[in-house]
Amino acid sequence: MSEASIAKKAELVDAVAEKMKAAVSIVVVDSRGLTVEQDTVLRRNLRESAVEFKVIKNSILRRAAEKAGLEGFDDIFTGPSAVAFSNEDVVAPAKIINDFAKDAEALEIKGGAIEGAVSTKEEIQALAALPNREGLLSMLLSVLQAPVRNVAYAVKAVAESKDEDAA
Protein backbone atom coordinates (compact mmCIF):
# COMPACT_ATOMS: atom_id res chain seq x y z
CA MET A 1 0.00 0.00 0.00
CA SER A 2 1.33 3.43 -0.84
CA GLU A 3 2.06 6.05 1.77
CA ALA A 4 -0.60 8.32 0.27
CA SER A 5 -3.20 5.58 0.66
CA ILE A 6 -2.16 4.96 4.26
CA ALA A 7 -2.32 8.70 5.00
CA LYS A 8 -5.83 8.91 3.48
CA LYS A 9 -7.00 6.01 5.63
CA ALA A 10 -5.46 7.57 8.74
CA GLU A 11 -7.34 10.81 7.97
CA LEU A 12 -10.55 8.84 7.51
CA VAL A 13 -10.03 7.04 10.83
CA ASP A 14 -9.47 10.41 12.54
CA ALA A 15 -12.61 11.89 10.94
CA VAL A 16 -14.78 8.90 11.92
CA ALA A 17 -13.33 8.92 15.46
CA GLU A 18 -14.27 12.60 15.81
CA LYS A 19 -17.81 11.84 14.61
CA MET A 20 -18.04 9.02 17.16
CA LYS A 21 -16.84 11.28 19.98
CA ALA A 22 -19.26 14.07 19.04
CA ALA A 23 -22.28 11.81 18.49
CA VAL A 24 -24.89 11.39 21.23
CA SER A 25 -26.26 8.38 19.38
CA ILE A 26 -24.71 5.90 16.93
CA VAL A 27 -26.66 3.12 15.22
CA VAL A 28 -24.89 0.43 13.18
CA VAL A 29 -26.92 -1.48 10.59
CA ASP A 30 -26.50 -4.10 7.89
CA SER A 31 -28.17 -2.63 4.83
CA ARG A 32 -27.40 -5.47 2.41
CA GLY A 33 -30.35 -6.18 0.19
CA LEU A 34 -31.89 -2.70 0.27
CA THR A 35 -32.90 -1.42 -3.12
CA VAL A 36 -31.53 1.90 -4.33
CA GLU A 37 -34.97 3.43 -3.84
CA GLN A 38 -35.22 2.16 -0.25
CA ASP A 39 -31.70 3.37 0.53
CA THR A 40 -32.52 6.80 -0.90
CA VAL A 41 -35.69 7.07 1.19
CA LEU A 42 -33.84 5.97 4.35
CA ARG A 43 -31.04 8.50 3.78
CA ARG A 44 -33.58 11.28 3.13
CA ASN A 45 -35.49 10.46 6.34
CA LEU A 46 -32.26 10.47 8.34
CA ARG A 47 -31.01 13.71 6.74
CA GLU A 48 -34.31 15.47 7.62
CA SER A 49 -33.59 14.70 11.28
CA ALA A 50 -29.96 15.90 11.07
CA VAL A 51 -28.59 12.34 11.19
CA GLU A 52 -25.51 11.49 9.12
CA PHE A 53 -25.56 8.04 7.48
CA LYS A 54 -22.40 6.49 6.00
CA VAL A 55 -21.21 3.10 4.77
CA ILE A 56 -17.74 2.61 6.26
CA LYS A 57 -15.35 -0.35 6.21
CA ASN A 58 -15.28 -2.36 9.45
CA SER A 59 -11.50 -2.06 9.79
CA ILE A 60 -11.81 1.74 9.74
CA LEU A 61 -14.75 1.62 12.17
CA ARG A 62 -12.79 -0.59 14.60
CA ARG A 63 -9.77 1.74 14.57
CA ALA A 64 -11.97 4.83 14.90
CA ALA A 65 -13.92 3.31 17.82
CA GLU A 66 -10.65 2.44 19.54
CA LYS A 67 -9.35 5.97 18.97
CA ALA A 68 -12.64 7.45 20.26
CA GLY A 69 -12.41 5.33 23.42
CA LEU A 70 -15.44 3.18 22.62
CA GLU A 71 -14.98 -0.48 23.51
CA GLY A 72 -17.19 -3.47 22.78
CA PHE A 73 -17.87 -2.82 19.10
CA ASP A 74 -15.97 -5.91 17.86
CA ASP A 75 -19.13 -8.05 17.68
CA ILE A 76 -21.08 -5.26 15.98
CA PHE A 77 -18.50 -4.51 13.27
CA THR A 78 -18.92 -7.74 11.31
CA GLY A 79 -20.24 -8.02 7.78
CA PRO A 80 -21.24 -4.93 5.80
CA SER A 81 -21.85 -1.96 8.10
CA ALA A 82 -23.56 1.38 7.66
CA VAL A 83 -23.47 3.86 10.53
CA ALA A 84 -25.92 6.60 11.53
CA PHE A 85 -24.47 9.42 13.67
CA SER A 86 -26.63 11.95 15.52
CA ASN A 87 -25.14 14.90 17.38
CA GLU A 88 -28.47 16.32 18.58
CA ASP A 89 -31.27 13.81 19.13
CA VAL A 90 -30.49 10.54 20.92
CA VAL A 91 -33.71 8.87 19.77
CA ALA A 92 -33.93 10.02 16.12
CA PRO A 93 -31.56 7.55 14.39
CA ALA A 94 -32.85 4.57 16.34
CA LYS A 95 -36.49 5.51 15.73
CA ILE A 96 -36.10 6.23 12.01
CA ILE A 97 -34.06 3.09 11.33
CA ASN A 98 -36.28 0.85 13.47
CA ASP A 99 -39.45 2.15 11.79
CA PHE A 100 -37.85 1.73 8.37
CA ALA A 101 -36.68 -1.82 9.22
CA LYS A 102 -40.30 -2.84 9.87
CA ASP A 103 -41.09 -2.21 6.19
CA ALA A 104 -37.70 -3.15 4.70
CA GLU A 105 -36.79 -6.60 5.98
CA ALA A 106 -33.32 -6.32 4.42
CA LEU A 107 -32.31 -3.64 6.95
CA GLU A 108 -30.99 -5.14 10.17
CA ILE A 109 -29.92 -3.22 13.27
CA LYS A 110 -26.64 -4.59 14.63
CA GLY A 111 -26.16 -2.35 17.67
CA GLY A 112 -24.71 1.04 18.43
CA ALA A 113 -23.78 3.49 21.14
CA ILE A 114 -25.87 5.81 23.25
CA GLU A 115 -24.00 8.74 24.79
CA GLY A 116 -20.69 6.88 24.60
CA ALA A 117 -21.89 3.51 25.93
CA VAL A 118 -22.03 0.55 23.55
CA SER A 119 -25.60 -0.73 23.14
CA THR A 120 -27.04 -3.99 21.87
CA LYS A 121 -29.61 -4.38 19.12
CA GLU A 122 -32.32 -4.82 21.76
CA GLU A 123 -31.32 -1.61 23.58
CA ILE A 124 -31.40 0.35 20.32
CA GLN A 125 -34.88 -1.03 19.57
CA ALA A 126 -36.05 -0.12 23.09
CA LEU A 127 -34.69 3.40 22.56
CA ALA A 128 -36.64 3.59 19.29
CA ALA A 129 -39.87 2.94 21.20
CA LEU A 130 -39.38 6.15 23.23
CA PRO A 131 -40.88 9.41 22.01
CA ASN A 132 -38.44 12.03 20.73
CA ARG A 133 -37.38 15.08 22.74
CA GLU A 134 -40.33 17.21 21.60
CA GLY A 135 -42.76 14.42 22.48
CA LEU A 136 -41.28 14.04 25.96
CA LEU A 137 -41.38 17.80 26.53
CA SER A 138 -45.04 17.99 25.49
CA MET A 139 -45.86 15.11 27.87
CA LEU A 140 -44.06 16.91 30.69
CA LEU A 141 -45.86 20.16 29.89
CA SER A 142 -49.28 18.49 29.94
CA VAL A 143 -48.48 16.90 33.32
CA LEU A 144 -47.41 20.28 34.69
CA GLN A 145 -50.51 22.03 33.30
CA ALA A 146 -53.01 19.50 34.70
CA PRO A 147 -53.09 20.81 38.32
CA VAL A 148 -53.37 24.44 37.18
CA ARG A 149 -56.15 23.49 34.77
CA ASN A 150 -58.02 21.64 37.55
CA VAL A 151 -57.77 24.67 39.86
CA ALA A 152 -59.08 26.91 37.06
CA TYR A 153 -62.06 24.57 36.51
CA ALA A 154 -62.78 24.51 40.25
CA VAL A 155 -62.68 28.32 40.50
CA LYS A 156 -64.94 28.62 37.46
CA ALA A 157 -67.41 26.12 38.94
CA VAL A 158 -67.50 28.03 42.24
CA ALA A 159 -68.04 31.32 40.38
CA GLU A 160 -70.88 29.81 38.32
CA SER A 161 -72.57 28.35 41.40
CA LYS A 162 -72.39 31.74 43.17
CA ASP A 163 -73.90 33.42 40.07
CA GLU A 164 -76.75 30.90 40.11
CA ASP A 165 -77.33 31.43 43.84
CA ALA A 166 -77.36 35.21 43.37
CA ALA A 167 -79.89 34.94 40.55
Curated annotation (Swiss-Prot):
**Any one Gene Ontology cellular component term annotated for this protein:** large ribosomal subunit
Q: Which Pfam families match?
A: Ribosomal_L10
* GO annotation terms (biological process): translation
Highest taxon, organism lineage: Bacteria
The UniProt keyword set, sorted, is: Ribonucleoprotein, Ribosomal protein, RNA-binding, rRNA-binding
Q: Name one GO molecular function term.
A: structural constituent of ribosome
* NCBIfam families membership: PRK00099.1-1
- Stated name of the protein: Large ribosomal subunit protein uL10
